[in-house]
Amino acid sequence: MFASADQLICHAMGDYVVQSDWMASHKTKSSSAALAHAVSYALCFIPLTCAWTSFGWSPSTWLPSSVRWSALLFICTTHFIIDRWRLARYACWAKNFLAPRHIEVLHPDGHPEAGKSAGWIRNAPWSECSGTGYDSSKPPWMAVWLMIIADNCFHVLCNAAALAWL
């Protein structure tokens, strides 16, 4: 299983070109907006889910019976779930528990406390990170982009699995 350039193009078309402003603005608040986006997103994958002839793609393979409906349904469903509940923010928050945060106090050489650590601090609670998965110590623009990148990784992984195994 791997992501092909074709798959990445379909993903970009579905998530950035075909998605309307209304879908983008409301998909985390409204299931109808999330569903409209997920369906339009999945439709971008039709060329990759159609049967291929030994000579490559052919218009005759656009018959409904030749479409891998299970792959399209999986792509649509996972896209709906990931976007509707903005699952990437949970992953961004949870990953910070893989290694606890440590504060190191830097004192000038010769100071009696030089080289000593202040100790461990707990990770930020969900209430401080629920928007993007990152707390306020991360610049807002960076927190949003890191969440978008994580979101894209989840979509590409789900799509690759669907195209490889369904």
Regions found by a protein language model. Name each.
Residues 1-166:
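Hydrophobic alpha-helical transmembrane segments
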